[in-house]
Amino acid sequence: MLAKRIIPCLDTIGKKVVKGTSFINVRVVGDAKELARRYEKEGADEIVLLDITASEEGRSTFVDVVTDVASELFVPLTVGGGIKNIEDVRRLLKAGADKVSINTSAVENPDLINQIASEFGSQCLVVAIDVKRRGKKSWEVYIKGGKVPTGIDFKDWVIEVEKRGAGEILLTSIDADGHLSGYDYELLEYALSYSNLPLIASGGAGSLEDLYKALKIGVDAVLAASIFHFGTYSIPEVKRYLREKGIWVRLD
């Protein structure tokens, strides 16, 4: 049985980690390198590092930040934000990333999914999907840091990215993000019914029960930010709780 993964998310602007609510009203919560090292020591299974304004501002990838963070990190590091082409991916992997996450560029150029999977392997490609609910069992895909609607139905997109060679999906509910009221569990169940890819749940974790419910549904990993950044829970607390509830997680 594969262990379920606990993944802290570091949303960055420059070298600073920030956190907002529904992708807006962000505030600085710390330094990227320091937080990454802290979470690794606490027992994080992976770290996700996202430049949250790169795509919106049309900037290239933050290679210098990745190099700095990766230099003293030994857990897998997934990096995203502003990746436009194969060369961006190559630079990030060379800088120390283990996986790359693409979102806006995947929607604007779906062939990039095929190209990355072919060049580097599906195992290093995460497709991040940000969605807003638009009705019963209906969600729309958003890009540019959750600010631009695409008109693309989530179901259609999740099926397409799997066919094109994505290795994993990072699924974020914009509606739930930062509100600490739980993941969109209906969205997670819906995604699992249409995709066989490993699924990372993101957006809304506020309690230990929230994490448990998502993992119980069948996601492979839970990503969280606020509960770790603001000291609500430590990673060891989370893992002990999940073990007690019968969820298999790695304990150091």
From Swiss-Prot:
InterPro entries: Aldolase_TIM, His_biosynth, HisF, IGPS_HisA/HisF, RibuloseP-bd_barrel
Residue stretches spanning the membrane: none
Annotated pathway: Amino-acid biosynthesis; L-histidine biosynthesis; L-histidine from 5-phospho-alpha-D-ribose 1-diphosphate: step 5/9
GO terms, molecular function: imidazoleglycerol-phosphate synthase activity; lyase activity
Keywords carried by this UniProt record: Amino-acid biosynthesis, Cytoplasm, Histidine biosynthesis, Lyase
Function per UniProt: IGPS catalyzes the conversion of PRFAR and glutamine to IGP, AICAR and glutamate. The HisF subunit catalyzes the cyclization activity that produces IGP and AICAR from PRFAR using the ammonia provided by the HisH subunit.
Membership in a protein family: Belongs to the HisA/HisF family.
Name of protein: Imidazole glycerol phosphate synthase subunit HisF
Organism classification: Bacteria, Pseudomonadati, Dictyoglomota, Dictyoglomia, Dictyoglomales
